[in-house]
Structure formats: structure tokens, C-alpha cells
Amino acid sequence: MTQTLSIAAKSYPHTAFLTDPGFTVAGRAVELAAADPIYKAFAPMVRELRYDVSELAIATFLQAREAGAPIALLPVVLSGDFHHHSLTRWPGSAEINPADLAGRRVGVRAYSQTTGLWVRGILHEEFGVDAKEVTWVTTEEPHVASYVEPPNVERMTGKVLDVLERGDVVAAVLGPPALDGAQGPLVPIIPNWREAEEAWGARHQTVPINHMLTVRRDLLEAEPQTVSALYQAFGAEIEARKAADTAPGPRVRALRFGVTDELVAGLQIAIDYALQQNVIRTPVTVAELLDDFTRHLGELA
């Protein structure tokens, strides 16, 4: 009997095809992992290779690669967004200028959370606030067990929203699920954030990457045709979704398939920000991130 292919991916319009009982990959049936929210799949993937294929946050992949995890990155962006609006304060709390966050406490689910990577990069790039000048109050450990957090990272219990509501932090970084599920309107602290987001996009010629597609390296090496077929299936769905949207917002514009200029730009900025913030400590190039894909799927893709 042909072995089932295990895949961990969030339910998006462009991943709905994975739930079709008739969908197979090179003759292999697909078993979709139950991981909700999807970031619950990230630690099992990087620590124990629990899945054959997994959606993975780009910051987690950068750390996993540095730690030597045998996982390969495919040039498929499953989610992304601008993140100026992700830095928020509690309604009714004191207003604060982003430039004044140095020396203050800011909440974030984990220091290695990708939304936090982007927000810290924005603070440094646009407001002159270095990541090491802020105390980052976290509620979860890194997905990569061997990662050592900077000394200005603290841990608290509960959820980031609870920490923010209690006033233990002056602001908090919240990813899309937390923002979408918040009770009441949180207040973005970056002024004119919509305009600032579009200006960032114009300056960098990309939309920030949150999650990409990864595969166990041994599967890629042993069955490149299988991985290629799955890669093409994801690509077809992404291209169809983008083509169907005549006025795409940033979450649709962020979707990528293939090695495009926008993908390369997004990966390079993620690398730069990660090095600045000690999310990773070893320099790496975009070509090195995509080396497994290029060697094994370059001709097939």
C-alpha cells in the first residue's frame, strides 16, 4: 500500500484542495494534520519532523535551518501581511509614540514569532528603536528548542491579550488570529498605519512573508517528483486565487509561487531583520535558503 503523505496547513481558500478526499499526490493519499491554530504544528515539525510537509513561519524556518533541522524550504508563500497595524495598545490606555518604546515593556507571543520579527524591524527602520532597547514580554517558548533568547526577553503566563489588558505591557504585537479574535478594537500605535504600510511595501517592493511551505529533506531527496507535484498543486491554487481577486488586499498580494523578485526581496528583508534582532546569529543568503529546492526541483519545477 502506498504510504499516506502527512501535511500540516491552515485552512485557506488556496489550501482547500487538500481536503478533497479524491486529491492525491503522485498516487499518494493526503492526511491533513489537525493543528489549530496552525502554529501548534511548527514545534513538532522542527523538533521531530512529525509531518512530511508543513506550513511554517519564516522566522521559525530561519532558526530551524540555523539549528540544523533537515527541513527544506519551497518557494510558496501561504500567508503574509503588512504589520504596522499589529503593534497595538489597549483601548483607553495611554497613548504612546512608537519612538518612545525604548526602555518600555512590549508583549509578544514569542520572541521568535514572525509578526514580532516584522514589527521590530519596522520600529528600528522607521522609528530608530533597536530590539535590544525594549523588554519583550512573551507567553510562549520558541519553536526551536535550542534557540537561546536575548537577555531582554521575559516570560509570563496567560495570553498576550491578557498581559496587555492587565497593563503589564504598554503595547503588544499581535498576529492576525489574535487581532481578528480580540474582544473590542485594539488601537494601533503607529500613526497613519495604512499609509505607512503601503509606503513600506513601495520601498521594499514586497509584502512581508509570514508562512511558507516546507518539506522534510529526506522526502525531497527520495521523491522529488512527489514534492514537485504537490508544489505545482499549491502553485495552481495560489495563482487562481490571485487571478480571481480584481482588487487584492495585502494578504492576497503576499501570496507567492516560484522564485520571484518579490519573494527574494521578502526573504532578504526577513534575513536582515532576523540578524539585527538576534533571531538568528549566522548570516545566510536567500540562495542558501532555497538551495534544497534549486538542487532537487530546479528542473522539475
Predicted regions and their residues:
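Short helix-initiation/N-cap motifs at beta->coil->alpha
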Residues: 32-44, 96, 134-166, 285-295
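Hydrophobic/basic alpha-helical segments enriched in Actinobacteria
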Residues: 24-34, 186, 276, 283-286, ...
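Alpha-to-beta junction loops
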Residues: 47-56, 69-70, 104-107, 151, ...
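Short, glycine-/small- and polar/acidic-enriched structural segments
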Residues: 6-121, 125-129, 136-139
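Short, structured patches in soluble enzyme cores that scaffold and shape functional sites
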Residues: 91, 110, 138-140, 168, ...
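Pocket-lining segment of extracytoplasmic ligand-binding domains
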Residues: 147-242
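Secondary-structure end/capping motifs
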Residues: 214, 219-279
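Conserved C-terminal helix/tail region of periplasmic/extracytoplasmic solute-binding proteins
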Residues: 209, 279-301
